[in-house]
Amino acid sequence: MLEVNDGTGVFADCTLLEEADLSQTGITELEGTFEGCSALETVKLPENITKIGFGTFTGCSSLEKMDLSQTLVTEIGGSAFSACSGLKTVKFPKTLTAIDSYAFLSCKNLTGELDLSQTAVKTIGICAFYKDGGVLGKIRLPKTITEIGSEAFSWETTDGPEKIYVITSLSKDKINAEAFKRNVPVVVCPYLYTIKFDGNGAAKGKMSEKACAAGQKEKLSK
């Protein structure tokens, strides 16, 4: 039995590794742990893990799902899941506060609903969910969000998500240039402020409280 006490790069480039169980270890942080493990299909993580660090699963093209909902993860680091071309679903924990730049870059099969509404996410980094193939179905953001990086939700195709739910107050938020690069419908959630975007995804002001209370759907154009 292999005893693992440190999650830094321990299985990097093990291209024949298909399954890994770290659930009984005391590891709380991972970094580069499974980078380049192209055959990896199943991973069990310890519930007390707090950080999925830089490049942890980069290039794990056979990984189809990741369930972090029962963990204590607060941060998903830069490029943590980049180039996971087979990744279809991700469940996020309530403890999550940050998704760093390029975290899910080029996850072309991550096309279902991206639901962050039950998390405590404050920041989403540059190109965090940038896609070069396929588009997200729906994006739900939490009311805790304070910053969305440039091209965080951009994609190469002209088709956008079905809807984007923005639950936030613009006066407290920072939305960087081209955060939502393509034109998308934005759903105004009842009794909450929301954000309108111009054709390049830049912030364009906020809806009135009256309009938000009624609930509206804004189709944005260039």
Regions found by a protein language model. Give the residues of each.
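Structural signature of tandem-repeat unit edges
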Residues: 1-5, 14-29, 38-51, 61-75, ...
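Consensus positions within tandem repeat domains that build extended binding/scaffold surfaces
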Residues: 8-12, 31-35, 53-58, 77-80, ...
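A structural signal for leucine-rich repeat
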Residues: 11-12, 34-35, 70, 118-119, ...
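Beta-strand secondary-structure signal
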Residues: 125, 194-196, 221
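Generic alpha-helical secondary structure signal
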Residues: 173-178, 218
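Solvent-exposed beta-strand/loop surfaces, strongest in extracytoplasmic domains of secreted
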Residues: 191-202, 216
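A short beta-strand segment in extracellular, disulfide-stabilized domains
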Residues: 215-222
